[in-house]
Amino acid sequence: MKVKLICVGKLKERYLKDGISEYQKRLSRFCQFEMIELTDERTPDKASFADNQLIMSKEAQRIHKKIEERDFVIALAIEGKQFPSETFSELISGVTVKGYSTITFIIGGSLGLDSIIKKRANMLMSFGLLTLPHQLMRLVLTEQIYRAFMITQGSPYHK
């Protein structure tokens, strides 16, 4: 199984890189994990709605190029479904049973995701109504993916 994490923007903070690197190492027992960082568009200070739409559209084009036709795509969006960790674990296990070999998670940039990416997604997922920096969300999601595999294994990691 392959798990891809497509992210808009570059990870800058060392502590986030270290945390994600640790979970990538742990995940290597269960899957091939790949994090793909895409260039984000600069958003002007007083960007109009049209400016924001254009920025999201450009970012969506970059994202779309990294999605394979047979990927099961889960896009993170505030309006998405929320799951307890156990249900998330079942979801990941169920995707492979349905014949998908790659799960692709998408985290948009500071403006979110363009509707074309949300429409392509097999599922929209949310971590709640809180607003989190998208760079921090990478670490949180990577940990939850690891936790999902540990739950499937019956590991005491998830208590």
From Swiss-Prot:
SUPFAM superfamilies documented for this protein: alpha/beta knot
Cited InterPro entries: Alpha/beta_knot_MTases (IPR029028), RlmH-like (IPR003742), tRNA_m1G_MTases_N (IPR029026)
Subcellular location(s) of the protein: Cytoplasm
Biological source species: Streptococcus pyogenes serotype M12 (strain MGAS2096)
Signal peptide location: none
HAMAP family: 23SrRNA_methyltr_H
Job description of the protein: Specifically methylates the pseudouridine at position 1915 (m3Psi1915) in 23S rRNA.
UniProt record similarity statement: Belongs to the RNA methyltransferase RlmH family.
Domain of life: Bacteria
Biological classification of the source: Bacteria, Bacillati, Bacillota, Bacilli, Lactobacillales
Major place of residence: cytoplasm
Keyword set, alphabetical order: Cytoplasm, Methyltransferase, rRNA processing, S-adenosyl-L-methionine, Transferase
Entry-linked Pfam families: SPOUT_MTase
Binding site for S-adenosyl-L-methionine: 76, 108, 127-132
Gene Ontology MF terms: rRNA (pseudouridine-N3-)-methyltransferase activity
Protein name listed in UniProt: Ribosomal RNA large subunit methyltransferase H
A GO CC term assigned to this protein in UniProt: cytoplasm
NCBIfam families: PRK00103.1-3, tRNA_RlmH_YbeA
UniProt-listed Enzyme Commission number(s): 2.1.1.177
Reaction catalysed by this enzyme: pseudouridine(1915) in 23S rRNA + S-adenosyl-L-methionine = N(3)-methylpseudouridine(1915) in 23S rRNA + S-adenosyl-L-homocysteine + H(+)
Subunit comment: Homodimer.
